Structures are given as C-alpha cells and as structure tokens.
Amino acid sequence: MPKNIAVVIQEDPRKTHRPVEALRIALGLSAGSHMTTVVLLGEAARLLGDETDDILDIEILEKYLPAIKQLEIQFIIQDIHNPIEVQDDFSVKRENDETIRSFIQSMDCTLVF
C-alpha cells in the first residue's frame, strides 16, 4: 500500500554529505508507489540553489537533479527572512514553521536527516 512519506533534510550540504544522500533516498522512494515530499530546512535549501560549488558531493547531486526534476518531486522549503534562491524548474512551496510541523505530523512515515 502506498504511503505518504516526508524526507526532512535539516543539515547544511556545505558541511556534511548527509543532505545529498537524503535526496538520493527521496528519489528512490519517489520512483515507487509512495507519495514522497522533501522538506528542506534552513541551509538545506542550497541543494536546489543556483550556487552549488561549495556543496559536498556536488558530483552526485548533479547526477540526480535531472531525475528529481523529471519526477516532479514536491519540495517544501522553510520560509525564512533571508531565503535561499532556488532554481525555478523544481516544484517548490515555501511554508512557515507551523505549516511544516503540521504537514510532517500528517505523514505516514518521516525520515529526518
């Protein structure tokens, strides 16, 4: 039975490899029958940004971004005072903390990185 899954990425992709790996996992979940949404908190929004030179594992990220775009994976980005600009060709909604909290609580399963 398909599940509603949230993949929450909260770590800075400039400091650890985990955000890119989390995005790869989300891609794998999306390829199946599950409804997968990726929630990017804080600096994790850099994964979808134009300036990716300082992201760890950028080669891996660049390999998976086309598939993420093609599958139209849904992203929710934390609405902060100084938002990180993301590429236009992703399916992105900016939401406040309370909306994100409610969304995560409504999921069947949540993976946090």
PLM segments and residue spans:
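Residues at the starts of beta-strands that form the adenosine-phosphate
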Residues: N4, H34-T37, Q74
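Short, glycine-rich nucleotide/cofactor-binding loops
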Residues: A6-V20, A45-D53
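Histidine-anchored nucleotide/phosphate-binding helix
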Residues: P19-V38
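Short beta-alpha junction loops
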Residues: L41-R46, I80-N82
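A glycine-rich helix N-cap at a beta->alpha junction
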Residues: D54-H81
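Short, well-ordered beta-strand core segments
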Residues: F75, T110-L111
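Active-site regions of enzymes building and remodeling cell-envelope glycoconjugates
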Residues: D88-E98
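An anion/phosphate-binding loop that grips the pyrophosphate of nucleotide cofactors and donors
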Residues: M107
